[in-house]
Amino acid sequence: MAIQIGINGFGRIGRVAFRIAISQPERFHLCGINVRNADLDYMVYMIRYDTIFGRFRGELGTYEKGITVNGKKIPVFSESDASCIPWESCGAEYIIDATGAF
């Protein structure tokens, strides 16, 4: 059974955690991402054209509440206060904090 994870922060470390989770679906299910001031199109761009890992080889897109990766919807939250992120709404069991704030 895959571990349900959420990612808080989507800079370099958050995107690395994203790629690891997406590349191992048997181990991880990415069920949410929190980005302060989220811009969904920019998130997709940053995933697609990574200067370290190269071009993302899957399907990427956006929908009204988040991004799609290989046909799977991942909700994106835009909370500045970590205590207000609704992780329970997506079923996250573990949160990767990639903000550097904690």
Annotated model-derived regions:
Residues M1-F102:
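N-terminal Rossmann-like NAD(P) cofactor-binding subdomain of oxidoreductases
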